[in-house]
Amino acid sequence: MEEYLGNEDLLDRYLVAFFASREYSEEIAQRAVQWAEEICQTDKVVISGFHSPLEKEVLRILLEHKHPVVVALGRALYKRVPPNLQQAFDEGRLLFVSFRGYTRHSTKSSEIRNWKAAGIADEVYFTPFNRFSLLSTLHFTYEKYSKTPVHILE
């Protein structure tokens, strides 16, 4: 059961999912920053768990540019909006989506969150990942079986 907190109208806009591996080079980090800055020049809404370090950096850039975001949670909704997200929330540029009612975050809930976020996105972007990453299965499945455009930031 999905639960929402924030501006649900963001779901009616063009959604771009962003997933980043926890392991990345400085070159990949620079490419992700460049991608985030380019996205800020569009009206696309970025959806992600914003959980990995690189995803958090992309979120920081999006918020700095006052760009709308959907924060996908693999756990229950926050009881209070985190301070770093409060302004975006107050300005209607933020939506939290909970795909699981669990109170604790886990690897499995992260995986489910990523699949659900990709499932509602109009386009999906990944940073490079190794073949053992949880992102590998998601990427392979979407690239092979989905009509959703899939990209890897090279």
Locations of regions flagged by a protein language model:
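Glycine-biased, small-residue-rich flexible motifs in mid-sequence functional cores and linkers
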Residues: 1-154
